[in-house]
Structures are given as C-alpha cells and as structure tokens.
C-alpha cells in the first residue's frame, strides 16, 4: 500500500492531480482543503495517501497532512460513505464545521453536502460523535493558497472551479450559480473555497 507520496506536481485539474515520483505518474484525488495548499506546477510536493483497491480500479487519495488523512479514514469506515463522498465532506465543510455539526446533531448542515441525505447524516453523527475532538488540528486548519500558485480566475480557471464542484456532486447549474460569488481576480484555490461556502449557505 502507498502511504506517502513525494514527487513533482505535473498537473492540477481539481479534484485530481498528477504527481511524478521516480518517473511514474500517479493520479491522485484530493479534497479541496488539500488542493488549496498545493504548490505550483513542476514544484516538489509531498502527500499522505490512502489507497483504495476495488475490483475495477485502484484509487489513490492524497492529503496535505496525516490528520486530514485520518479524518478521511474515519469517514470511509461509516456505512454508506465511500471515498468520493468523504472527499465531498472534507471539501464542503471545514474540520471545525464538521465537528460542530456532529456535536450539535445538525442534520441540516450535513445534508447540504451533495450525496448526504438524512439517513447518512444521522449515521455520521452516530459514528463520529466524541471522536473528532481527539484528532490533531494543526494541519486541519483552513489553508491559505500556496505561495506562487495563484492564478487569476479567467475562463479556463472558472472551468476548473466548475469541474471541481461537479466532481464533488454539485450540478452544473449549482456550480454556475456559485461562481457568481467569486470576484474577478481571485486565485483559483480561493475561488473554489468561496464557491463551496456559497453552496453551503441555506
């Protein structure tokens, strides 16, 4: 199993990136919390990884820190929560927002994440109650965009943001509406976070 990946960042097409490690290109799915912390293209990158082996595919998920990976692993242990849904949760809610929603049994907030219905939200609360507070929080804080990685939000970058939102389960219409909350001149990583916050509003 691959637990850590160190190499050169070749491509960024949220939520997937391509990392060259020893001449091999690894396709890695990352949550937006990690995407926002990535360096620029052709820069060194280190990710903590989780490998999921299925009959039809071997999937690699990457995270900026161990604690974020541990939270992902806690999520996928819950019945009905797979890798894609866990990424959507980590992308749509900050760790403190997720912990607060679980502690307050806030089904409404959890259900705003695409793919999370009432029953899944109830299972999340039941399984995670009392567990999130024990996670290290140092590398789960809201990340700032990586230095040198800023890109202006123009047509291509807006397409990347829309693609990322749709990969998380939002519809094209929802993604387009969320883009209206992203000011011109905002870098892509921040644009994704702003769009997700807009989608999380009641």
Swiss-Prot record:
Keyword DNA repair in record: yes
Gene3D superfamilies xref list: 5' to 3' exonuclease, C-terminal subdomain (1.10.150.20), DNA helicase RuvA subunit, C-terminal domain (1.10.8.10), Nucleic acid-binding proteins (2.40.50.140)
Region described as Flexible linker: 144-152
Keywords attached to this entry: Cytoplasm, DNA damage, DNA recombination, DNA repair, DNA-binding
Naturally occurring in which organism (per UniProt): Laribacter hongkongensis (strain HLHK9)
Gene Ontology terms for molecular function: ATP binding; four-way junction DNA binding; four-way junction helicase activity
Keyword Protein biosynthesis attributed: no
GO BP of this protein: DNA recombination; DNA repair
GO cellular component, one term: cytoplasm
Region Domain III, residue ranges: 153-202
Region (Domain II): 65-143
Cited function: The RuvA-RuvB-RuvC complex processes Holliday junction (HJ) DNA during genetic recombination and DNA repair, while the RuvA-RuvB complex plays an important role in the rescue of blocked DNA replication forks via replication fork reversal (RFR). RuvA specifically binds to HJ cruciform DNA, conferring on it an open structure. The RuvB hexamer acts as an ATP-dependent pump, pulling dsDNA into and through the RuvAB complex. HJ branch migration allows RuvC to scan DNA until it finds its consensus sequence, where it cleaves and resolves the cruciform DNA.
Primary localization: cytoplasm
Protein name: Holliday junction branch migration complex subunit RuvA
Subunit details: Homotetramer. Forms an RuvA(8)-RuvB(12)-Holliday junction (HJ) complex. HJ DNA is sandwiched between 2 RuvA tetramers; dsDNA enters through RuvA and exits via RuvB. An RuvB hexamer assembles on each DNA strand where it exits the tetramer. Each RuvB hexamer is contacted by two RuvA subunits (via domain III) on 2 adjacent RuvB subunits; this complex drives branch migration. In the full resolvosome a probable DNA-RuvA(4)-RuvB(12)-RuvC(2) complex forms which resolves the HJ.
